[in-house]
Curated annotation (Swiss-Prot):
(R)-pantoate binds at residues 57, 150. It is found in: Cytoplasm. Belongs to the pantothenate synthetase family. The lineage of its organism: Bacteria, Pseudomonadati, Pseudomonadota, Betaproteobacteria, Burkholderiales. The gene is panC. GO terms for molecular function: ATP binding; pantoate-beta-alanine ligase activity. This is Pantothenate synthetase.
Length: 283
């Protein structure tokens, strides 16, 4: 595995390839990340992963300084997964001067859900992904569906800027009990880890209610919020949205509309997110 620490090193090495397949990460890799790398391998002639903890997408009170940096372990995992190139710039390499030119995504998508609770988050995400795209020049990039809103944002950005990049969404990788894998799961205590599965269970209960014919979506959402709150969680949102644009669907017109249940909630000091796609109801 070739490791590039500067943009020039990366571009020089990738000049020999025609179809890079790219997986951007912030490190602290788990099996979910490695599944993305393995999915990317047959999609290009070289698989490129990046590790960069992007300051721009962290709010002042969030965990930028304490976000786990696990360099040696990450490199070994990527080698084992068959990654061909690792781009691991430091902050000075990727942001040699203050990043005053930023990507401000569509507020209709960026200012709801995660964007509402983490203002400016998607500006930071889209800006760093655009910059990484310019460095790697991939023909395909693989993102996990666990960050559902982020995936939609990246697809929208690629479409709006006519970037010649195919965006592939990969299914969420889960532990045996159903918990979505996340780098932040490591913050959980043993007791919190046992409790954390309740987030995916709440999403399943929401999906089952819709599939059983219940049409009062606000009531479904309220039940899910209450169920977690009663267990000691601090939920930000548990909502049912259209998959097409993440807007609230009409309860009276759900036929043929694919939905997604999305959740964000804090358990102790750890904020977890998850989602579950729901098949369209028959007409």
């Amino acid at each position: 595995m070739y490791i590039a620490h500067t943009i020039d090193e990366l571009r020089s090495h990738l000049a020999a390839f025609r179809r890079p397949a790219f997986v951007p990460t912030m490190g602290n890799l788990h099996e979910g990340h490695l599944a993305l790398v393995k999915q990317a391998k047959p999609l290009g002639d070289v698989t490129v992963a990046s590790i960069f903890v992007n300051r721009l997408q962290f709010l002042p009170h969030e965990d930028f300084d304490t976000y786990p940096r696990t360099w040696d372990s990450d490199c070994e995992k990527l080698r084992t997964a068959g990654c061909g190139v690792l781009f691991a710039p430091d902050e000075k390499a990727l942001y040699p001067e203050p990043q005053t030119c930023k990507v401000h995504p569509d507020p209709a998508l960026a200012d709801i859900l995660e964007g509402h609770f983490r203002p400016g988050f998607f500006v930071g995400v889209c800006t760093v992904v655009m910059k990484l795209f310019q460095c790697v020049q991939p023909r395909v990039a693989v993102f996990g569906k666990k960050d559902y809103q982020q995936l939609m944002m990246i697809r929208h950005m690629v479409r709006q800027f006519a970037l010649p990049i195919e965006i592939v969404g990969s299914e969420t990788f889960r532990a045996d009990d159903g918990l979505a894998l996340s780098s932040r799961n490591g913050y959980l205590s043993e007791a919190e880890r046992a409790e954390a599965v309740q987030l995916s269970k709440a999403l399943k209960a929401m999906a089952q209610a819709v599939q059983a014919g219940e049409r009062d979506l606000a009531a479904i959402e309220a039940r899910a919020m209450q169920a977690l709150a009663q267990r000691g969680w601090q939920p930000d949102y548990l909502v049912l949205r259209r998959r097409s644009d993440l807007q609230a669907p009409s309860s009276a017109n759900l036929a043929g509309e694919p939905l997604v249940a999305l959740a964000a909630a804090r358990l102790g000091g750890t904020r977890l997110i998850d989602n579950l796609e729901i098949d369209a109801m028959p007409s």
